[in-house]
């Protein structure tokens, strides 16, 4: 053994041990989970049925009264669940103008597979969509990934910290100044994985302590975002069926056949690929996008979609940027569309343009969103957002939103918001104070001032339903400058 290059051997006769010193590169890095991974739970299946319902009645001086009953019926066993929702409405007096009778919302059969984290759905379904595509209601079948079935899985890449220990060592991890935990290491190279869930930009400090109490600290910056998929992980769904028409008005009104599919794949820990397709008899749409982490500088997303619907072709371009820390965050999102762009959300419209070739139903031409938030510590949180939308007939909508919130004593909080319509030049202001009263009771005081309704003062008291059964109730009172005062009470 001593003849090997850079190897030193020493025999400990007392301990009957052969001690070897070998080159560092000979020792493979030991992967050490930093903290205990969330244990994968074994689902417990039962068999049964339930009925959820909500009864509501009201009476107004001018429009009369009405009563409505909403319901959810559900049957479940170890294979899945079957549910149906809807409501029945009855006009009690006067001419309220509301539709009477029964209206069905959704009837859905769902089968889940926790091992593969997938779900089969049949009946009334909603197609899967990405941040740059649209979802639609359909009657048909859907199959796709459902990570909510596996809460033990972390779908986005978490940082790994590597180093080397010469002697048995303990390691403490501090993230953004807070101690996140500790673990023990044996001599040799190491890689710490399974770190606590973190998001945004920050600094991690590794403090190693040997048996003699000597400490060495190493600072390592990181940027984590849940928008990415971990390398090798995929996500997606496919939906086939007929487009749902007049949802919430007609019970069984379905239109032409259509299909939709979305897919995401984590190519690397800093690059996630996305794709989306839609199709019908006179519609073909396809799009591709990326989410890229720029090291510690944030995340950029982009996507391009091309469509052809009833002979019209068009494109859609989306892009954005996000950056967040524990002190502030900034987000921008933008979209640009051609006039001929179409998708399933527009496909079943009776007509897209009027007799003057102006759009009746269309997506916006340009959309721009900017948001900025600051964490002021003991002084609360401040946020600002600007949204601009331009239609194909050059109509513009520009909104400015400002907000401030702060925790007060106990779990109480105060919230102040103001918004301005740039075209109208009007401000809307709201101030709200939330005060918890015990475990299940809370009170709220709200002051509002809007251009249309004037000033409004509201008092609200809420009692939530006990977990072991019972009733919940709510009482509200409001005084309005441009309308009659009102009182309201609910029992559930």
Task: Please report, for each region that a protein language model flagged, where it lies by residue.
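Short, charged low-complexity linker/loop segments at the C-terminal edge of domains
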Residues: 26-30, 437-443
């Amino acid at each position: 053994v001593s003849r090997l290059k850079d190897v030193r051997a020493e025999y400990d006769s007392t301990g009957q041990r052969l001690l070897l010193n070998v080159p560092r590169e000979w020792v493979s890095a030991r992967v050490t989970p930093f903290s205990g991974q969330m244990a994968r739970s074994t689902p417990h299946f039962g068999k049964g049925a339930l009925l959820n319902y909500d009864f509501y009645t009201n009476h107004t001086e001018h429009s009369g009264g009405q009563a409505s009953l909403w319901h959810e019926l559900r049957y479940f066993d170890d294979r899945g669940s079957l549910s149906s929702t809807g409501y029945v409405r009855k006009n009690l007096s006067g001419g309220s103008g509301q539709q009477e009778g029964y209206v069905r919302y959704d009837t859905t059969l769902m089968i889940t597979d926790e091992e593969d984290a997938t779900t089969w759905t049949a009946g009334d379904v909603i197609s899967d969509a990405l941040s740059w595509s649209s979802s639609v209601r359909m009657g048909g079948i859907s199959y796709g990934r459902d990570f909510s079935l596996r809460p033990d899985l972390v779908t986005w890449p978490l940082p790994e910290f590597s180093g080397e220990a010469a002697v048995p060592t303990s390691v403490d991890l501090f993230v953004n100044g807070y101690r996140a935990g500790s673990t023990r290491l044996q001599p040799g190279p190491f890689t710490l994985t399974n770190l606590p869930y973190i998001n945004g930009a920050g600094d991690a400090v590794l403090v190693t302590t040997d048996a003699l109490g000597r400490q060495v600290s190493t600072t390592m910056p990181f940027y984590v975002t849940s928008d990415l998929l971990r390398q090798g992980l995929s996500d997606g769904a496919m939906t086939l069926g007929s487009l749902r028409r007049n949802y919430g008005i007609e019970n069984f009104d379905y239109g032409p056949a259509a299909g939709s599919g979305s897919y995401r794949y984590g190519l690397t820990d800093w690059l996630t690929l996305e794709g989306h397709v839609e199709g019908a008899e006179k519609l073909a749409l396809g799009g591709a996008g990326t989410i890229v982490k720029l090291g510690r500088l944030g995340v950029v997303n982009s996507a391009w979609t091309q469509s052809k619907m009833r002979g019209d072709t068009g494109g859609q371009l989306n892009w954005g940027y996000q950056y967040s820390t524990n002190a502030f965050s900034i987000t921008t999102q933008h979209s640009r569309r051609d006039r001929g762009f179409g998708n399933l959300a527009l496909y079943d419209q009776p007509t897209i343009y009027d007799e003057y070739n102006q759009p009746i139903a269309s997506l916006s031409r340009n959309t721009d969103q900017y948001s900025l938030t600051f964490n002021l510590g003991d002084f609360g949180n401040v946020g600002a957002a600007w949204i601009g939308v331009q239609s194909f007939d050059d109509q513009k909508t520009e909104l400015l939103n400002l907000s401030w919130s702060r925790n007060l004593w106990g779990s109480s909080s105060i919230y102040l918001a103001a918004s301005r319509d740039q075209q109208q030049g009007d401000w809307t202001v709201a101030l709200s104070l939330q005060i918890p009263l015990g475990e299940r009771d809370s009170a709220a005081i709200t002051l509002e001032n809007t251009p249309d309704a004037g000033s409004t003062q509201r008092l609200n008291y809420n009692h939530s339903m006990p977990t072991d059964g019972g009733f919940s109730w709510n009482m509200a009172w409001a005084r309005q400058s441009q309308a009659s005062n009102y009182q309201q009470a609910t029992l559930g």
